[in-house]
């Protein structure tokens, strides 16, 4: 069985076990009889056996999604706006120009071209202030990356910092700041207090008159931690205020919580580490164009057409109780293939030479089955979800949508 079909079959079986007859509309007519038989047999079993069967189905699904157990997201889990916007761009829900207004979001074409998984990480809440000169402020941040699977190869990583516009006077030349990003090379306990051994990863000169997100390349550090298994002592962020004092330190670049502002504001504006990786399965992320409304064609000719073709099948994640950890989409149109493969096979039935021969033999020998109506082309979907560690993940899953059917 094609992996995509097996995936859908398990979903449908889970829906039947969880919801009974209320989900019968999701099952093709030809399968309702078999589903009823399954339910009849299941009704005679002990409830413990049914729950065990359901757990097996769920475990199979989670394995397909690359998860070791079912995520149980906490109420404090935060979905960064950046990841939501990235999902919308990746899935083609909205154009980049519409999404980027006021957010500074640009689709990461180069990192995404080598990845099928994007993960986001917030730093551990405790911050370590690093004493510096009167013109700068610096902090050390720790990011726990232990939730990245062993089979996922990280290709790049970026650190996103939010900076707000600050009115410091009319003098343009006095409004420049330099933001330096360092990798901490040794644990603070082994160093002189107030001094870190670091290496520079990225730097940028910015002006205080703009509110936007800044993105810094921290790939060398993250690759050392994940590929080379080197110790992770965190990143150091230094903001140097050129030609000025520290009057507005902490107001321009959001690297620490501001007490007067609400926790919700800080949750969305705090520093964000984003990794791009590939687990070796399927294609890389590719930004899709915005979807247009489908054109409606007359269905009169199809009502009597029983030949092999694609039919609608919507899979709703809430029906299997997964809408608490799958952020988007709420469901998707999977489609399925059903219909006859009559002799002689028409060109539009997308048949193989073998299917043509098999159908020809069937016409004179009924003991040989007809060719079957099966998916001939499958496509991927993007999913945004919370994993077992409350980390937000954007991932491409292959062979989830039927694009074409044929007799094979």
UniProtKB/Swiss-Prot annotation:
Name which cysteines form disulfide bonds: 308-373, 337-405, 341-407
Q: Which InterPro entries match?
A: BMP4_TGF_beta-like, Cystine-knot_cytokine, TGF-b_C, TGF-b_propeptide, TGF-beta-rel, TGFb_CS
The entry lists its GO molecular-function terms as:
BMP receptor binding; chemoattractant activity; co-receptor binding; cytokine activity; growth factor activity; heparin binding; protein serine/threonine kinase activator activity
* UniProt KW keywords: Chondrogenesis, Cleavage on pair of basic residues, Cytokine, Developmental protein, Differentiation, Disulfide bond, Extracellular matrix, Glycoprotein, Growth factor, Osteogenesis, Phosphoprotein, Secreted, Signal
Phosphoserine modification sites are 91
Q: Which GO terms describe its cellular component?
A: extracellular region; extracellular space
| SMART domains hit by this protein | TGFB
Q: What does UniProt give as the signal peptide span?
A: 1-19
> What does the annotation say about its assembly with partners?
Homodimer; disulfide-linked. Interacts with SOSTDC1, GREM2, RGMA, RGMB and RGMC. Part of a complex consisting of TWSG1 and CHRD. Interacts with the serine proteases, HTRA1 and HTRA3; the interaction with either inhibits BMP4-mediated signaling. The HTRA protease activity is required for this inhibition. Interacts with FBN1 (via N-terminal domain) and FBN2. Interacts with type I receptor BMPR1A. Interacts with type II receptor BMPR2. Interacts with FSTL1; this interaction inhibits the activation of the BMP4/Smad1/5/8 signaling pathway. Interacts with SCUBE3. Interacts with TGFBR3.
Protein name according to UniProt: Bone morphogenetic protein 4
Tell me the organism. Answer: Mus musculus (Mouse)
């Amino acid at each position: 069985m094609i992996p995509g079909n097996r995936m859908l079959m398990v979903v449908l079986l889970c829906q039947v076990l969880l919801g009974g007859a209320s989900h019968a509309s999701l099952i093709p007519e030809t399968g309702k009889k078999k589903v009823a038989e399954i339910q009849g047999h299941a009704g005679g079993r002990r409830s413990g056996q049914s729950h065990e069967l359901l757990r097996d189905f769920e475990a199979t699904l989670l394995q397909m999604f690359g998860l070791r157990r079912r995520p149980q997201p906490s109420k404090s889990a935060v979905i960064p706006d950046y990841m939501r916007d990235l999902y919308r761009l990746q899935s083609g829900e909205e154009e980049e120009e519409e999404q980027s207004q006021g957010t500074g979001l640009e689709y990461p074409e180069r990192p995404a071209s080598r990845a099928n998984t994007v993960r986001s990480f917030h730093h551990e809440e405790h911050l370590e202030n690093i004493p510096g000169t009167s013109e700068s402020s610096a902090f050390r941040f720790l990011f726990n990356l232990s939730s990245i699977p062993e089979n996922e190869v990280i290709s790049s990583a970026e650190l996103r910092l939010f900076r707000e516009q600050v009115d410091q006077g009319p003098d343009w030349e006095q409004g420049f700041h330099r933001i330096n990003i360092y990798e901490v090379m040794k644990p603070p306990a082994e160093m002189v207090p107030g001094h870190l051994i670091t290496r520079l990863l990225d730097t940028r000169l910015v002006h205080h008159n703009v509110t936007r997100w800044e993105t810094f390349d921290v790939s060398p550090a993250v690759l050392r931690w994940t590929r080379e298994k080197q110790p992770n002592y965190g990143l150091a962020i230094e903001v140097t205020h050129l030609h000025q004092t520290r009057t507005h330190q902490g107001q321009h670049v959001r690297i620490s919580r501001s007490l007067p502002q609400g926790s919700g504001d800080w949750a969305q504006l705090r520093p964000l580490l984003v990794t791009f990786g590939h687990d070796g399965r399927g294609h890389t992320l590719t930004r899709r164009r915005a979807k247009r409304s489908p054109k409606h064609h007359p269905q009169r000719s199809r009502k009597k057409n029983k030949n092999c073709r694609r039919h609608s099948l919507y899979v709703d994640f809430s029906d299997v109780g997964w809408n608490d950890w799958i952020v988007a989409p709420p469901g998707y149109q999977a489609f399925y293939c059903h219909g006859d493969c009559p002799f002689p096979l028409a060109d539009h039935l997308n048949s193989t030479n073998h299917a043509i021969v098999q159908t020809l033999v069937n016409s004179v020998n009924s003991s040989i089955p007809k060719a079957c109506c099966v998916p001939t082309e499958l496509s991927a979907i993007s999913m945004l979800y919370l994993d077992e560690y409350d980390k937000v993940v954007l991932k491409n899953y292959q062979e989830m949508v039927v694009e074409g059917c044929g007799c094979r």
